[in-house]
């Protein structure tokens, strides 16, 4: 119970980071720069995040083991309670993280195959 309570803020942080990575110029800041416009950019960014399957994976002792853990989570049914209940699609590529895989961090593996972006990884310090 205490472990789930401790990981909830990390999962929320991971979701926010994925939203920032995938949002690009369509995030809340673009809405603030355009006075008088309807805030249509925020729902589009949220929809992008919902289409993306994001998973949190604890880092292992070596980058190779962390990459293997990311690959296992992104290509099979996730075991983490905060992960999506569906596995990545068969056509998903192997994870090619855009951030360094360092020990002592959590990594969010995001499968953006719907938009042809491949899988991204965002490093989250513990």
Curated annotation (Swiss-Prot):
Keywords: Signal. Residues 1-23 form the signal peptide. Enhanced expression in male flowers. Accumulates in the tapetum. The keyword Signal applies. This is MFS14 protein. The lineage of its organism: Eukaryota, Viridiplantae, Streptophyta, Embryophyta, Tracheophyta. The gene is MFS14.
